Amino acid sequence: TKAPVIQGTFLNPSYTEADLLGYLGDSCVTEVYGLGGMSAIAGPAYLRMTGSTIAEARSRTEKARAVSLGEHTFAPIPWDDFRGFPVGLDARRVVGLNILPISHGGSALKKGGQGGAGAAELPVDCFKDALRAIHKEALAWAEQEG
């Protein structure tokens, strides 16, 4: 699966999308925990970099809740009725509901350095591949157990 390109703000106006690598790095890992795009409503200051609005951030977070297993309760968001941010993406829900999570991250330049920051929609193929791998492992385990 090809990594999506981050859409957002460039640090230098001379940069273009062609200067950027696909989305990679540790920002992807923070999304698994529920930080970043999953909790867009909790970080209004980040909205300017992603070219987003409060309404879009609320929508992103609600969509993330629809495809997540639960919510963190240790960090309630006051302007979101004190709800926690979504955690635990469920690949079955992502594929079944066709709701693709939005991830926040930095934009790495092909020649090195940071080009900007923003958001990227995670490709559905990542989730389909994960489900196929789990299915394959489950079948192998079942055959081994007899």
Named regions from a protein language model:
Residues 1-146:
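Anaerobic metallocofactor- and corrinoid-dependent redox/one-carbon enzyme cores
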